[in-house]
Structure formats: structure tokens, C-alpha cells
Amino acid sequence: MLQIYNSLTRKKEFFKPDHPPQINIYVCGPTVYNHLHLGNTRPLIFFDTVKRYLEMLKFKVYYVVNITDIDDKIIETSLKNQVLEKDLANKYIKSFNNLLETLNIQTINFKPQATQYINSMILYIQTLLDQGFAYFTDQGIYFRVSKITDYGKLKKQDLSQLKQNVRKQLDPQKEFPGDFILWKKTSQGITYPSPWFAGRPGWHTECATMIEQLFKLPLDIHGGGTDLKFPHHENEIAQTHAHSHQKLANFFMHVERLDYQNQKMSKSLGNIIWCKDLLKQYNPCIIKFLILSTHYRKPINFSYDLMEQTQQKYKKITYFLTKNNFYLKVNHFFCQTLDQDIMQLFHQLMQDDFATHKVIDLMEQIIKRAHQTQILDKLSQFQNSLLLILNTLVIAIPFNKPTKKDLQTYFLWQDARKCRDFIQADILRKQLLDKGFI
């Protein structure tokens, strides 16, 4: 039975959706003021695999990834580049969708944009005001954190520490340093009319509102990068409790960071590996292979040496499938059966909190076992099992498949060897070697 590590309880728990076979998943997506870097892409690759596997288990998964298309960073970038916020956002939404297509991430059912829900956000905030969970200052409307008794539970955030680590540009009218903006009063950048004053919604309110608009609470799974635990997901939890008196999600899943040069990859640090640039050098499946080779709750320290090692592992699987498939073809052997022991182990690994790194190791073991036998039935089962696993991980291996001419070349080569026509045999052998068949 599937077990998932729940960030909220800090332990693995058996996963049971509220309304099987339906599963609802919401993952926080990009703020579209730039292209996505490799760290941004890691959760998207991982949750794509999560959905594929859940569907393999016959669940019906509705998977939403939001797009934050209005935000201070978008406004800052648009002013700097002298373009409209909408045009800037649309440019990077297109870049985001192109990246998803290139990486073959096709499982997202809906990608809501924050600007499509402004009216709903206004109504949401008004409810919080009416219930005493929000208050006005000269700078906007804030959420009153003190009214949430277990605020900080997701990351075990110490509120006394929060007082000490207050932002420099603190609104002096805030009741508590941890109170967060629901509606920002501003004249800079795009603003929206409201019953109170022109402004725009806070990021945490955007997601909380969209979740309630799109799903019946609680979510089965709420996901994102580990950096979103606090304050973003914590503030979503607080707002949902205040607004609807419900819990936001049964399971929280957080994907660890991706480091570069032993530092967290981030735009603010400038140590960015843009996915669009990496894709100019590597097959998209090698990038996915790299991401899935480390458990999602462990950080990845990216390096180009690591990329090269991953590429060699990918090639090893490609070579095996090319040769093994050819061997089965020339022996006129075909079956659709799987190796049940391998598949049982695969499911054990995936149902243990999606241990994709161990599944990668399992694939290497399949190849090792295949090299130790010439039994056609076993080789076919190994190949079928490996291909099914790769398909679940959404890693395509475009291995060479023999044509009729290739098969004829093989049999001519065998005949030349029997006739001791070594010159012709060498010519034919080279043709097969060049295609990776032998």
C-alpha cells in the first residue's frame, strides 16, 4: 500500500484519498517574470511522475499547477524593461509551456492564472475581514496571524524567532511581524479596483483562493518546493482555516532544493542553470533522469560532471535495449509478459514514498541480470519490464529498432562467417556495430 511522507506530520503515512478513485493534487507553479531554472523544474518533473504512477494504480488524478502572473517581481521586471506586466507574463507563460512540452510533462490538467481570479480574491479577503482575521493599515490589508493557534506547525516555525527576524521594511502599523499582506495598497504597477482601495492581492491569498475555487477541500496532496513550506504554504493553511474552517490538504509533499556549486540555485544569488540552455546540450530525458536519480526529499548538488555521469547511465540503457531487442528479433521471439519479481520490487519502491532513485538502481540491476542469461523468455520479460518502468518515469529511450534490411544483414553476416568469407563478414559486422545491434 502506498506510503507518502507527510510534511505536516513529519512521518510516512498510508495514503488514502478522501473520494477514491479520485485524487486531487495542487502544486505551486512558477511566478512568470523569467524563464525556469533547473531548481524550478525539479518539482514539475517529480510530480509528473507521481501522477503517472497514481494513474498506473488506476486512480483518476486531477492535477493543477498554478501560474502567478501578477506579483511584485513581475512589476519590478516590467518597469525595468519598460513593458506591460501582461506582456511580460505572457512571454514567460509561453516559455513555461514550451518547456513542459519539451520535457514531455503532459499530465497537468489545468494551469490557472492568478489574474483570472481577482474578483474571487476580493470576496475571499472580505470574508476574512468580516470574521476578524484581517485588518487595515495605511499600506493594505493584513492577515491576523495571532488568531491561528497552531500557526507555524508546518515548519515548526518559532514565532518568537519570527519577531527577531523581521523584515527591514516593516509596516509600523502591523500588529505582529508575521502578519502577511492580503491586499496591497500601491500606486506602482498594475492595480485592481476593490471595495476598499485600488491594489493587488498578496501571493499567499492568490493560491488559497484558487484552491478553494477549484477543489472541494481538503486537497489529497498539496505540493511544491521545500522553500514554500514557510511562509507560503503555512499562510495558505492559516487562511483556509480562517475562511472555510477546513484543513487545506491531507498530505503536504515538498521537493528539496537543487544546489549549484554547493549553494541553493536561485535567481537572487545569480547561480542559475536555465533549463532552456541545458536543453541545448542534453536530451530532455537525461535531465529527467538526473532529477529522478535522487530521492525528492534529498537535495541535489548539480554539476556538469554529474550530468555526464547521468548521460552515460542513459546511454547504457539505450545500448542494452538496442542490442536486446535486436537479439529477440533475429531469434523471432516476441512476448508481452513482464518479470513479476521485478515489477513487484518496482511497486514496493514506488509505494515507499516514491523512491525513484532506487528504481533507477533497479533498472541497472535488470541490465546486469540480462547480461547473465541467453534465455529468450527472460530477456523479453526484462525488456518489457524495463520499458514499462521507463514509461512510468516518463523517460523515453529512442533505441534503434531493426528494419527488415538490418535483419537480412545479420543473417548474411552469419552465412559469411559459416562460409569463412571473413572480408564480407567484417563488412556486414561493421554495419551492425554502427547501429548498435551487436
From Swiss-Prot:
Enzyme class: ligase
GO BP: cysteinyl-tRNA aminoacylation
Enzyme Commission (EC) number: 6.1.1.16
Catalysed reactions, semicolon-separated: tRNA(Cys) + L-cysteine + ATP = L-cysteinyl-tRNA(Cys) + AMP + diphosphate
Keyword Metal-binding: yes
Protein residues bound to Zn(2+): 28, 207, 232, 236
Pfam family, one: tRNA-synt_1e
Superkingdom of origin organism: Bacteria
Cofactor binding note from Swiss-Prot or TrEMBL: Binds 1 zinc ion per subunit.
Ligand binding (ATP): 267
GO CC entries: cytosol
Motif ('KMSKS' region): 264-268
Cofactor(s) the record lists: Zn(2+)
Molecular function terms, GO-annotated: ATP binding; cysteine-tRNA ligase activity; zinc ion binding
Keywords annotated in UniProt: Aminoacyl-tRNA synthetase, ATP-binding, Cytoplasm, Ligase, Metal-binding, Nucleotide-binding, Protein biosynthesis, Zinc
Motif ('HIGH' region): 30-40
Primary location group: cytoplasm
Compartments in which it is found: Cytoplasm
SUPFAM superfamilies referenced in this protein's UniProt entry, alphabetically: Anticodon-binding domain of a subclass of class I aminoacyl-tRNA synthetases, Nucleotidylyl transferase
Quaternary structure (record): Monomer.
Family to which the UniProt record says this protein belongs: Belongs to the class-I aminoacyl-tRNA synthetase family.
HAMAP family referenced in this protein's UniProt entry, alphabetically: Cys_tRNA_synth (MF_00041)
Protein name: Cysteine--tRNA ligase
Species, as recorded: Aster yellows witches'-broom phytoplasma (strain AYWB)
Gene, per the UniProt record: cysS
